[in-house]
Amino acid sequence: MQVSQQYHAAQRAFQDQFDTRRLADRLAESTSDVIGESFKRFIEERDMFFIATSDAEGWPECSYKGGEPGFVRVVDQHTVAFPVYNGNGMFLTAGNLAVNPRVGLLFIDFEIGTRLRMSGHASVDPNDPLKSAYSRAQFVVRVRAREVFANCRRYVHHYSLVERSRFVPKGDVDPPVPDWKLDEWFAGTLPHDDPALDPDHPSAPSIPVF
């Protein structure tokens, strides 16, 4: 992508106000729609990422997606794929992608601070051939890269992994039911095949605490 296409007028105005146009132009030279080997390795080592979407009217939504390392796959030099697991049933991200495929992804290694940004166009497919590779995936999202670039890590706080979520599907092992689905407030609202309707299915704490 040419630098002239990288920035819109308002971004240019701020760059000129703070004398960063030259710096911005140089950084733009590092963006590409190609996912190189080092980026591929970084993405496929992650166990989480953030995804930004917006609806048909432009209202934004930001979500966290987690899984086992490797749950995001680089299927070719321009495309990543990831599963959508059972969630809260709102389908805010998937619904947005169905009406507005433009998407932003942010991958971070919080132990060393490295981060990678990717924007592109997404597609949602319940019959994607990759679906069978993911235990209990409802469907698969693929994102075709428009821009991929590494980002400065100076303001990333460092964290260490304590424990991965027990709710992430793993092979033939049934993950526990989130305990919020057992609350009386949700009685009569769950899908007919939701594991939470099985009184013998184990549950685990997941209610938000504030």
Residue ranges of predicted features:
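Binding-site signature for planar aromatic cofactors or substrates
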Residues: 1-210
